[in-house]
């Protein structure tokens, strides 16, 4: 028997819970190790607030919020020889970005990316897109480097050096970072 106390609020709450259930179940399948979860940490005085610092060997990204204070996130980084190093700026930010492999990726891995050769096809944004929920585009001197800080469909890659060069984050973590970081932010990858 259906209760007459079934209000609009109850309907909305029940519907929202139902929509989130698949995401919740998916998130429960893999728990990121504790050290790679976002946490506030102290950083050196020499690191200016308002910038991103990425330490690929330790698989951490730091958003420096204030003097001596940063949010540290675990990341996945590029395989040896494919990683980005140096300084860039975030010139573009996108929610649920489209994706296509770079020409170098197509050449390096034709078995995986051959269907993209000789065309401009791109995968639309969405839950199965390798760039995940958000992407921050790295530029040098106004030119796209084709390196990104982005979400991932492979959360187990966090803490590993397995990508084609980009910096991968858990989708909820990159969404949090996306909201904090403005266009023009300096990114240093050591």
Task: Mark where each language-model region is.
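N-terminal secretory signal peptides and thylakoid transit peptides that target proteins
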Residues: 1-18
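Short aromatic/basic micro-patch
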Residues: 5, 130, 168
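Sec/Tat signal peptide C-region and signal peptidase I cleavage site
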Residues: 23-27
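Gly/Pro-biased beta-strand-loop elements
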Residues: 32-147
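Short Gly/Pro-enriched loop/turn and capping motifs at secondary-structure junctions
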Residues: 141-143, 154-156, 174
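Histidine-centered active-site/metal-ligand motif
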Residues: 150
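Short, basic/aromatic beta-hairpin or loop at an interaction surface
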Residues: 157-165
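N-terminal targeting pre-sequences for secretion and organelle import
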Residues: 167-190
């Amino acid at each position: 028997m259906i209760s007459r106390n079934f209000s609009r609020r109850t309907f909305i709450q029940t519907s929202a819970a139902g929509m989130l259930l698949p995401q919740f179940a998916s998130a429960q399948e893999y728990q990121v190790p504790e050290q790679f979860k976002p946490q506030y940490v102290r950083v050196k005085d020499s690191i200016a607030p308002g910038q991103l610092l990425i330490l690929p060997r330790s698989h951490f990204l730091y958003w420096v919020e204030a003097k001596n204070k940063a949010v540290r996130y675990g990341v996945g980084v590029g395989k040896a020889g494919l990683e980005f190093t140096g300084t860039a700026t975030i010139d573009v930010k996108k929610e649920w970005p489209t994706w296509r492999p770079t020409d170098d990726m197509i050449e390096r891995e034709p078995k995986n990316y051959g269907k993209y050769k000789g065309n401009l096809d791109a995968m639309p944004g969405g839950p199965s897109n390798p760039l995940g929920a958000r992407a921050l585009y790295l530029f040098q001197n106004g030119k796209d480097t084709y390196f990104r800080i982005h979400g991932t469909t492979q959360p187990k890659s966090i803490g590993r050096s397995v990508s084609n060069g980009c910096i991968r984050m858990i989708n909820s973590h990159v969404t949090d970072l996306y909201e904090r970081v403005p266009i023009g932010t300096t990114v240093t990858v050591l």
